[in-house]
């Protein structure tokens, strides 16, 4: 019975991937889209709820930690509601709606500023295809491919901070204009502050703002295109899974363009409990993401936006009654490289629950 279950059961996977929600780079690429690696079952419908909470409170300048003198932080919660319909035994369609909530403390105009915002993010439509679904005795292997479009449904007004009028033409001449920024109008202060941040001209990292409009925006204002694939393999009680996603991004609100980004994850583990209608597995998961520099109007490069991070942590998955599937994971950063001054993550927690009708 167990061999039959292994052959036909729901693949114990991390409900991960990955959809891209504008935010801090570590938050952009590692979100859920509540995707399962189960083969589609014709006319089946799945409803999923997934949550990722990320705590960002470590400031890094060009990959090196600096003192967080003013206790800047960003707490980011992304809850994704997902519905998936299996058109056939190899193809399914999915809609993912993120609800984003962020709370932060940062430095603006030499003053401590606290803020928060919440709302619907950028909705994603995905199509999944399973070209390979191999099963032979104790061995199971499954290849999944997906692609889709991310719609500009989220509020992107915070990106206006990044596109203050006139800053494109003045960036090259603004070095050393730090003193002038304190005596100008509110708009000019915002302009000079932006220029200093994105050109690294603030010489006291401990007082530099590490949280910007691109970190806290709920949406991008752009039409983006996620593409990816996942491979799942199971032999007896051992599990291996790897996933990768690349997101192509276009120009969005305020002429702001988020950099294309890569996200990947690989996990290995073993069943702790395995029966016909229930299973529990423990896995070790290594994941990461990479994105380059965001750009503005005319291709101007924003120097505090590149990010390359690697995370590791445990993950527990469970299946009940062949209908309910859940996952709980915890990630710690083991390597983070960033450009200029940014707030970076100290930990994140992931949880998801899926029901198949």
Which residues does each predicted region cover?
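Short glycine/proline- and aromatic-enriched beta-strand/turn motifs that initiate or cap beta-hairpins
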Residues: 25-74, 156, 205-207, 211
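Hydrophobic, lipid-facing positions within transmembrane beta-strands of outer-membrane proteins
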Residues: 45-47, 77-81, 121-125, 143, ...
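Transmembrane beta-barrel strands of outer-membrane/channel proteins
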Residues: 45-53, 95-99, 145-151, 233, ...
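Short loop/turn motifs that connect adjacent beta-strands in outer-membrane beta-barrel proteins
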Residues: 36-44, 90, 132-142, 158, ...
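Residue-level signature of outer-membrane beta-barrel architecture
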Residues: 51, 85, 97, 129-131, ...
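Outer-membrane pore/translocation modules
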Residues: 102-259
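Outer membrane beta-barrel transmembrane domains
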Residues: 58-62, 66-69, 253-357
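Transmembrane beta-barrel outer-membrane domains
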Residues: 40-42, 72-76, 115-122, 138-140, ...
């Amino acid at each position: 019975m167990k061999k039959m279950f292994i052959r036909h059961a729901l693949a114990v996977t991390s409900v991960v991937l990955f959809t891209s929600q504008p935010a801090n780079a570590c938050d952009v690429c590692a979100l859920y889209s509540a995707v399962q690696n189960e083969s589609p079952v014709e006319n089946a419908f799945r409803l999923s709820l997934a949550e990722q909470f990320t705590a960002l409170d470590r400031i890094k300048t060009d990959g090196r930690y600096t003192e967080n003198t003013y206790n800047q932080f960003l707490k980011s919660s992304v809850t994704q509601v997902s519905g998936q319909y299996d058109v056939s035994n190899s193809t399914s369609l999915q809609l993912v709606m993120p609800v984003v909530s962020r709370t932060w403390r940062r430095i603006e105009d030499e003053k401590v500023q606290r803020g928060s915002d919440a709302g619907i993010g950028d909705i994603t439509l995905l199509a999944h295809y399973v070209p390979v679904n191999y099963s032979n005795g104790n061995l199971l292997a499954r290849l999944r491919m997906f692609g889709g479009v991310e719609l500009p449904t989220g509020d992107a007004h915070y990106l206006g901070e990044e596109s203050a009028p006139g800053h494109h033409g003045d960036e090259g001449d603004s070095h050393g204009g730090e003193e002038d920024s304190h005596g100008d109008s509110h708009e000019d202060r915002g302009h000079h502050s932006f220029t200093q941040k994105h050109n690294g001209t603030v010489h006291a990292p401990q007082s530099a703002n590490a949280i910007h409009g691109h970190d806290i925006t709920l949406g991008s204002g752009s039409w983006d295109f996620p593409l990816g694939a996942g491979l799942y393999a199971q032999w007896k009680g051992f599990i291996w899974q790897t996933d990768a996603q690349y997101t192509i991004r276009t120009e969005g609100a305020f002429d702001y363009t988020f950099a294309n980004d890569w996200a990947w994850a690989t996990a290995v583990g073993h069943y702790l409990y395995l029966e016909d209608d229930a299973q529990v597995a423990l896995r070790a998961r290594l994941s990461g993401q990479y994105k380059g520099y965001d750009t503005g109007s005319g291709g101007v490069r924003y120097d505090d936006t590149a990010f390359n991070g690697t995370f590791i942590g445990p993950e527990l998955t469970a299946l009940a009654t062949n209908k309910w599937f859940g996952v709980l994971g915890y990630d710690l950063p083991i390597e983070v490289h960033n450009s200029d001054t940014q707030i970076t993550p100290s930990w994140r927690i992931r949880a998801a629950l899926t029901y198949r009708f």
